[in-house]
Amino acid sequence: MDLVTIYSRKECHLCEEAFTVLQKLRADLKFEINEIFIDGDEDLEKLYGEQVPVTLINGEHHDYWKVNPVRFKSSLEKHRQHQ
């Protein structure tokens, strides 16, 4: 099963919105979600800083700030074709 990772911050409204979109898409598209909070992790804060939420599909960068459902579905399909 595909793994979607979302790097988030606590009390981040964009992060909450992105996570909600992913949860809705998961029902139809069948993937797992792993949410990682970057708060307090110096390396992740340097890497992602103000770009959160950052989404990865199977470990590869997908997008940041928002999850566009159409773009996400397209990217997930491309990942599945190359597996």
Protein language model annotation of sequence segments:
Residues 1-24:
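Local sequence-structure signature of Cys/Sec-based thiol-disulfide redox active-site neighborhoods
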Residues 3, 28-32:
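A generic structural signal for alpha->beta connector loops
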Residues 17-20, 46-47, 67:
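Generic recognition of short, well-ordered alpha-helical segments
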Residues 31-42:
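Thiol-based oxidoreductase modules, predominantly thioredoxin-like and allied folds used
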Residues 60-83:
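Non-catalytic, surface beta->alpha helical segment in thiol-disulfide oxidoreductase systems
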